[in-house]
């Protein structure tokens, strides 16, 4: 629920989060949750290496805290394609440990990613 605050251990504060953090091990493969086109690959201070995919109808899937990216901007990928691997968490997530940052946007605005995983 994007209307409730989440406690961030590293930051020692509660804040709203537009994403979910999936706890996992560093080096775990990250698979595309849906088919789409790689829109951008960027370095972000909070989410680290981040891949954003256009998935149609104004939606984007955003995957962060990655390393060893296996796709390039403009690539078309199918569901289940390895897009990269879980990397070392950024300083914003150091106490939470290795995780996949996953967010969804519609027309540039965050939407609850849980609704799209069910």
What function would you assign to each model-found segment?
Residues 2-31:
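Short glycine/threonine/proline-enriched tight-turn/helix- or strand-capping micro-motif at secondary-structure
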Residues 75-118:
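Conserved, short, structured surface segments that act as functional micro-motifs
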Residues 1, 41-42, 69, 86-89, ...:
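Residue-level recognition of beta-strand microenvironments
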Residues 28-38, 77-80:
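Generic structural motif
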Residues 26-29, 67, 73:
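Short, conserved secondary-structure segments in the cores of folded domains
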Residues 16-18, 26, 34, 47-49, ...:
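Envelope-exposed proteins and targeting segments
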Residues 11-13, 20-23, 50-55, 103-104:
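Short, acidic/hydrophobic/Gly-rich beta-strand patch recurrent on exposed beta strands
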């Amino acid at each position: 629920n994007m209307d409730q605050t989440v406690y961030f251990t590293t930051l020692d504060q509660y804040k709203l989060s537009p994403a979910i953090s999936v706890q996992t091990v560093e080096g775990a493969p990250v698979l595309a949750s849906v088919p789409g086109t790689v829109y951008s690959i960027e370095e972000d201070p909070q989410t680290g290496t981040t891949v954003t995919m256009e998935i149609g109808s104004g939606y984007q899937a955003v995957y962060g805290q990655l390393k060893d990216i296996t796709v390039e901007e403009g690539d078309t990928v199918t569901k289940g394609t390895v897009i990269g691997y879980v990397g070392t968490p950024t300083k914003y997530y150091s106490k939470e440990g290795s995780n996949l940052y996953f967010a969804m946007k519609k027309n540039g605005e965050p939407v609850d990613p849980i609704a799209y995983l069910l």
